[in-house]
Amino acid sequence: MDSLEARLQFIQVLKNLQKTLHKTRDSITSSSTTTPPSSQQKLNNDPIQFYLRNYRHHYEDFHQCLFDTTMKMDPLDRLDVVIYYVRIIRNLYPHSHSNTNVTKVLNEVLLMDIDLVFELCLPCQDWKSLTNQATCKELFLDLSKLIHYDATSVTHTPSDTTLIDATTWYSVKTERTTKDYKESLQRTESLLKDRDLKKLAFFQQFNSDTTAINPDLQTQPTNANILLHRMEADRELHKRSKETSWYIERPSNDILDESEFKSLWTHFETTDSGFDKDDYKNIKALNDIAKASYIY
């Protein structure tokens, strides 16, 4: 796949994130077992797997394409891109300690521009984009926990009595004087704290006794199709989270982790003398129930 083809395919991946971005955690290492055809089809359509399969040769193309394509979206539609971006980092980070190529892509590309990605979702002077604030905070805190970055200040909720300047919006672009991913994380932290204050300022006007609305806090009308698209995206995200709430993260795609199996095996060896007749009867009963469920 050449550079042009990679860009074209990645644009389609970004445009279809609402339909294809599942709430799963895919490992960069494949299982030793054979993947069933149905599962293979899902992996082929998975946007995270697409990135993991092709990023070694095209990560620069993908990165530039992500910003160019996302800039053309409405801010309400950009949340899926941030979710996608963070999940890519989550999949790559466990391998960064043993693979220098992964470390380079993470530290010099993905984490380096994490602040710009979040600002795409929370742009300056766009009040409706504050709808993305809560999810962005969750994503950043989740990412900070993964890479061991202290982001406790983001969890602090500003007081209702705080005096807020609604006219000045923090922008990470004016602060990008050095190239260091740790400073990029700090700028993202500052961005989220500023947007928390802007969100508070927006709601404070409805709690005040003044009848006049501050012109700096007025929002522009939003296209109905954009609102409906965002509502559908939120519904789909909620649906996916419910469908996979039972999911247990494994170090690999194997059914049972080796350490987990040993722990269970040792537990039964030390607390139970072994199987008795009742155990075998229970197993037979469960087997009969399982067979009966496949009669048709």
From Swiss-Prot:
GO biological process: DNA damage response; mRNA 3'-end processing; positive regulation of DNA-templated transcription, elongation; positive regulation of transcription by RNA polymerase I; positive regulation of transcription by RNA polymerase II; positive regulation of translational fidelity
Biased composition (Low complexity): 29-39
GO CC terms in record: carboxy-terminal domain protein kinase complex; CTDK-1 complex; cytoplasm; nucleolus; nucleoplasm
Keywords for the protein's UniProt record, in alphabetical order: Cytoplasm, DNA damage, mRNA processing, Nucleus, Phosphoprotein, Transcription, Ubl conjugation
GO MF term list: cyclin-dependent protein serine/threonine kinase regulator activity
Major place of residence: nucleus
Stretches the record annotates as Disordered: 25-44
Positions bearing Phosphothreonine: 35
Keyword Nuclease: no
Annotated compartments: Nucleus, Nucleolus; Cytoplasm
Modifications after synthesis and translation: Ubiquitinated. Ubiquitination leads to degradation by the 26S proteasome pathway.
Deletion consequences: Null mutants are viable, but grow more slowly than wild-type cells at 30 degrees Celsius. They are cold-sensitive, failing to grow at 12 degrees Celsius. They display flocculent growth in liquid media and they show abnormal cell morphologies, for example, a significant fraction of the cells are greatly enlarged. Deletion mutant is sensitive to the DNA synthesis inhibitor hydroxyurea (HU) and UV irradiation.
Further comment: Present with 2640 molecules/cell in log phase SD medium.
Family: Belongs to the CTK3 family.
Subunit-level organization: CTDK-I consists of three subunits, CTK1, CTK2 and CTK3 (also called alpha, beta and gamma). Interacts with CTK1. Heterodimerization with CTK2 is required to protect this subunit from degradation.
Functional description taken from the UniProt entry: Gamma subunit of the CTDK-I complex, which hyperphosphorylates the C-terminal heptapeptide repeat domain (CTD) of the largest RNA polymerase II subunit. CTDK-I phosphorylates 'Ser-5' if the CTD substrate is not phosphorylated at 'Ser-5', but will phosphorylate 'Ser-2' of a CTD substrate if 'Ser-5' is already phosphorylated. CTDK-I is also more reactive toward substrates that are prephosphorylated at 'Ser-2' or 'Ser-5' compared with an unphosphorylated CTD substrate, therefore efficiently creating doubly phosphorylated CTD repeats.
Protein name per Swiss-Prot or TrEMBL: CTD kinase subunit gamma
Organism: Saccharomyces cerevisiae (strain ATCC 204508 / S288c)
